[in-house]
Amino acid sequence: TDLLHENPNGSSNLYFSFSEFAYFDIYILKREGADKDWDAFGKRLNRDILGEVAELKKTMTADDDRKLVENIIVKTQGFVSGNIKEDEERPVELFRELLLLYKGVTKEQLRENMKYFLSAIMPTCEEYGMFMCVHPDDPPFPILGLPRIVTCDEDIDWFLHAVDNPHNGLTFCAGSLSAGGHNDIIKLANKYAERTWFVHMRSCHIFPNGDFTEASHLGGRADLIELARIFEKVNPNLPMRVDHGMTMLGDENRGYN
């Protein structure tokens, strides 16, 4: 919800606020059933998210709404899929239309689609020596009425066994996985290192209320030093990159983050 959250030390990073995202979902996107979804999700977090949203609504301005749309739809979707451009005049309406494409799609259907796709491309991967690596859902929990299928140990285990071929592997994104309090990052790394073909070295810190932010390379829930040891031991030639993290001292203009 905030792509340039300011930290006390002067750096900035990504910050995910459940109340702000729920406000966006309910009052800006106006998604059908959003209030019920967030009420249920709040109970899982032991938070009154609908109450927080009601209080937030009292202070949100038109400019605040515009910034949320810019962060959640324009910049994020433009980066991930390219479906929404920076100069899009009706980003909210277009985003609604894109979400409708998945209306009624269940987790089981998404899993079967994934299995179908991976099974279909394995012969080509084997022929040309290519290794596919699935990136975990980010964030690793259902949002916007969409099911998620790569969020935890059980999900990873499922897709690796559904298409049990060494060319079907995992992108171990420590940042995405560590944003979920249900994930033990070191345990996952040890379990799936042999089927991991790419590593994103990033760490998230989860606050007591469930909100999360990107942490420094020595902080957060993902022990990046231990992760490097685990993957280097199993596969010394495994591609790893630090991924985006805290922006400081002009990094933003150089593309480091």
What spans do the regions from the language model cover?
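Histidine-acidic metal/acid-base catalytic patches
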Residues: 5-6, 25-44, 48-64, 71, ...
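Solvent-exposed N-terminal domain segments of exported/luminal and surface proteins
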Residues: 5-27
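Helix-loop segments that flank and shape redox-cofactor active sites
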Residues: 138
